Structure formats: structure tokens, C-alpha cells
Amino acid sequence: MIFGIPRELKDHETRVGAGLIPRNVATLIAQGHTVYFQKGVMEPAGVSDEEFLKVGAKCVDTMEEIYEKCDFIGKFKDMTDGDMKMPFKKGQIIMTAFHMAEGTAKPEQVKILADAGVTCISIETSRYPDGSRAMTRPMGEIAGRTAPLLGGQYLQRQYGGSGVSIVPVTGARRARVCILGGGHAGMCAAQTAEGLGAEVVVFDVNIQRLEYLRTVLKNTDLRFMSKSAFAEEVADQLHLCLSRHGSSHRDPRYGSQHA
């Protein structure tokens, strides 16, 4: 099979889809496949073209060449208007975040891809046997582990925060950090907040998940609570509230001191 790695057209997007980084490309080539990459595809992420060339991948100048030559296209972000102008081929496989199952699909894009006979694989809906999402799980870990650090920054006065430090300071009270949802990202956020020395509470409506979290979060208060109960009982007691994007847990009283 011939694999292709095009550059992403969205601003500030430096990720590469389908795990097609140099070491994985080397594995594909060792198995007899061919891999093309667009010039500069990973330079924004600090990976040079030379690293792809060293493992046997072939460089092309344009995105059009990738689509013309390759059977499998590995992207990361959803298809932009520029992506949709590419020369698709019947039987071609495109793996990227299509977002077609989330109510945001563009009918005109679906029609173009269907008429071209392209097979679309949505990375955001691909799951492991345990139900976790294969491509979003590592991103959830990154987001979860960095969220308390960024949230702690916005607790500072110059960012409109309360002035409470997220790390322990002698003679001062600890920051109280709330995490809405104990999924993978929430668990990672709690581990970071614990490590920083904050007082941490995690809310979830899945008792089995809370029981599991009890085994990995030794200094975190775990609460079985709905969003309405949270809003009434706890929201005003917090310094920092963290929640994954798309969560339905929202309350207007979070204000500038919550992120």
C-alpha cells in the first residue's frame, strides 16, 4: 500500500494523523509499503524532513501529489475547503477527524467524498475494545496534565484571578481545585493537581468510575454528584474548576476565577 502524509492547512496545527511519525513510517517501509510525505510536514513540530528521508520515505512538494500517488491518506484535523479540492481517487482511504458523527458534518463534503468513492475513517470515533477512543485518549492525557498548570496561571491577579497560589505556600491556604468528570482527562488533571499540592475534588455520576479512581488518586476527594447538585452546593467554594471541552457541566458562577 502507498501511504501519504499531507501538511495540515489549519493555522497552528502541528500534529500528524494516523501515527505516521518517522519511527512508525520506518515500520511500514520495512513491511514493504511505500510512504510519501509533503515537504515540511512536521517542521512546525520540530521534526525535519531529513528524519523521514532517513527511514526511506519519499518527499513531494505539493499536497496534490500526495492525493494523486497514495492509497491511504493520514491526516489529523477535519477537512478544510482546501483539502476538499484535492484529486480524490476511487478506493482511496482517508483517515482524519471528520466529525461526521457529531452533528457537525457538512453535507457538501459528504457528497463530494461519497461521489469520489473515498473510504473515510474518523479518528475521533475509533475505539479500543474497552470503549476508550484510540486517538483522543493521548490528547486527553496531554490536556489533563497541563490544565492545572494553565489554570494555576489564570488564578494570578494579573490574569483576573483570585490570587490564590495553586502550589502550597507556607502560611497560606491551599488552592481548592474541582474537576468535573473523572474520565481519562479528568483523572490526569487530578493527578497533576495532587502533585502540585492543591486540594482536589473530582465529581462524576458514574460510581464504578469513582471506585476505580479511589485506587489511583490517594489524596483526592471523590464525589458522586450531578451537575445541578454541584452548582447548588460546591461551585462557590472553589478557586479553580476544570472540565473537558464539550462537557455539559456549566455554571455562570464560575466567573473569571474558574477555567
Residue ranges and their predicted role:
Residues 2-10, 82-175:
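Glycine/serine-rich phosphate-binding loop and adjoining beta1-alpha1 elements at the start
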Residues 65-81, 221-259:
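Rossmann-like NAD(P)-binding element
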Residues 78, 142, 183-184:
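Residue-level detector of alpha-helix initiation sites
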Residues 49, 85-87, 190-192, 214-215, ...:
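Short amphipathic alpha-helical segments
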Residues 64, 99-102, 125-126, 206-207, ...:
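Short, acidic/turn-prone active-site loops that include or flank metal/cofactor-
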Residues 7-44, 160-243:
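Glycine-rich phosphate/diphosphate-binding loop of Rossmann-like nucleotide-binding domains
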Residues 53-56, 138-141, 218-223:
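Short, hinge-like loop/turn segments at secondary-structure boundaries
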Residues 2-112, 116-118:
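An N-terminal-biased, well-structured beta-alpha scaffold segment characteristic
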